[in-house]
């Protein structure tokens, strides 16, 4: 799974075609509590549950931090 693939799926998950590496909970309208759940669920599905085991994934507040966390945990390249 690549960074680009993750971004494409997350754009669909929270219905925001402008979602990018600079997106945060503060500047992304659809990234509310339901959006957070959609992101977590999408990541779990895409990673076959591997993201469920990562501490802190549910607390992520920015796409750049999320991507970094996924890289550190060898979920994406």
Locate the predicted segments by residue.
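Phosphopantetheine-dependent thiolation modules in NRPS/PKS and related acyl-activating systems
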Residues: 1-77
